[in-house]
Amino acid sequence: MSMQDTLADMFTRIRNAQMAAKTSVSMPSSKMKSSIAAVLREEGYVGDFSVDEAVKPTLTIELKYYEGKPVIEQIKRASRPSLRQYKGTSALPKVEAGLGVAIISTSKGVMTDRAARAAGIGGEVICTVF
């Protein structure tokens, strides 16, 4: 049986690992997952990440905690394979009144909603993180 939504699997693995207080989480790698991990690292939600280019490429993400609680309080898939969500610049979501971020896939690459607004481009809303 093949996996239909690999990004939803990535977010679920992160949530489950944080609930179990793991220091890191591993998953099958892809370019999109690596781009999302890079954005999460830039925003301070996760520590470093690495891609092991073995027979099966594996992405390992180091999770961050603050005072014993996970830094990522909530991570939700917005656009899914059955219902894609594309937004223009003015319609990009503000997560938790600007305290969180939305990760957007644009023609210029994967970036946060703030960076997309600053660049004046819209795209597919992949997920929201708070």
UniProtKB/Swiss-Prot annotation:
It comes from the Bacteria. Gene3D superfamilies: 3.30.1370.30, 3.30.1490.10. PROSITE patterns: RIBOSOMAL_S8 (PS00053). The keyword Ribosomal protein applies. One of its GO terms (molecular function) is structural constituent of ribosome. GO terms for biological process: translation. One of the primary rRNA binding proteins, it binds directly to 16S rRNA central domain where it helps coordinate assembly of the platform of the 30S subunit. Belongs to the universal ribosomal protein uS8 family. This is Small ribosomal subunit protein uS8.
